[in-house]
A protein has these predicted regions:
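RNA-binding accessory domains that recognize and position tRNA/RNA substrates
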Residues: 1-57, 67-113, 121, 182, ...
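Active-site adenylate/phosphate-handling loop in enzymes that bind or generate adenylated species
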Residues: 4-15, 40-53, 124-125, 129-202, ...
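Conserved G/P- and acidic residue-centered "switch" motifs that form tight phosphate/ATP-binding loops
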Residues: 63
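A glycine-rich phosphate-binding loop feature that marks nucleotide/adenosyl-phosphate handling sites
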Residues: 119-122, 165, 218-225
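A short alpha-helix-loop-beta-strand transition element characteristic
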Residues: 208-216
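The feature marks non-catalytic terminal segments
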Residues: 215-270
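Conserved small/polar residues in nucleotide/adenosyl-binding loops
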Residues: 271-275
């Protein structure tokens, strides 16, 4: 095949020289039902077919990082579902729509995504009322992880995915991540854990989520934020603080899960008719 192709090229391009070691142009031939001959290739996303690595639950916020984390896991063949924590009236319907839009953008790479929208308002207010304010962020994160895990198990997911990057904010120090992981009994994957913000933004721009992520609508992680949040939380102390929630929290978590809204988000693929 190579000899026949080479002979044809030489006959039709008599001025072309053959250099098998350092060619300026490489000719590629793929044999399937027919022969495909080409001289350039465009790099795609790469990775594995979605679904070949089972199912995982993505904690999807309105920020830059979590959509990138979902995209990166989808590249490795993971089927994505997502959970978003909504806190009306402190977070608006536009904030919710922003997350739906982000899920749709990620679905262009991951296929259909079931987006579980959990009303987190009552739980946040209860934690704010009962727990030390410097621990608010971590305790709220711990309950998000608990809820996400319960939904994940219900949906037969084998792991959780978050968009945390170590040291980026107070809730993402090594100690803080250990404190949130302590309440989970399934693996937590953090694909962007060692990336800096510029590296994450570069991927977000490539997958077209960046412009949506920077829309100025607050999510529930940006409200009730302590002025001086703890950055080296003690897990035993967190557990002691959470005892203040014992009277109502289990029932509140159960209600939030049972009353969640589920949206099946599908890709908006645009096809151009051949001219």
């Amino acid at each position: 095949i190579c000899m026949q192709a080479g002979e044809y090229i030489i006959e039709n391009m008599p001025n072309a020289l053959v250099d098998v070691h350092h060619p300026e142009i490489k000719v590629y031939i793929e044999i399937r039902k027919r022969a495909y001959v080409y001289v350039t290739s465009i790099k795609g996303p790469g990775g594995m077919p979605v679904g070949t690595s089972d199912r995982s639950m993505l904690l999807l916020s309105g920020g830059i990082d979590s959509p990138v984390a979902g995209y990166m896991m989808a590249k490795r063949g993971v089927k994505i579902e997502a959970v978003y924590f909504h806190a009306p009236p402190y977070t608006s319907e536009r904030a919710k729509q922003k997350v739906v839009d982000l899920a749709r953008l990620v679905s262009e790479y991951a296929g259909n995504i079931n987006l579980h929208i959990v009303n987190f308002t009552d739980i946040q207010l209860y934690i704010y009322d009962k727990c030390p304010h410097d621990e608010l962020t971590i305790i709220m994160r711990r309950y998000m992880m608990r809820i996400a895990e319960k939904i994940a198990r219900e949906r037969h997911c084998l792991s959780l995915i978050t968009g945390e990057s170590v040291g980026q904010v107070a809730s993402q120090t090594m100690q803080s991540l250990a404190a949130t992981d302590a309440v989970c009994n399934m693996p937590v994957f953090r694909p962007v854990i060692a990336f800096d913000k510029n590296e994450i933004i570069e991927i977000a721009e490539k997958i077209d989520t960046f412009e949506t992520s920077i829309q100025p609508f607050e999510d529930c992680c940006t409200i009730f934020v302590a002025k001086h949040p703890v950055t080296k939380p003690d897990i035993a102390k967190m557990e002691e603080s959470e005892k203040n929630l014992a009277e109502k929290i289990d029932e509140m978590v159960k209600k939030a899960i049972e009353e969640r809204e589920v949206i099946c988000v599908k890709p908006c693929l645009l096809y151009t008719s051949p001219s």
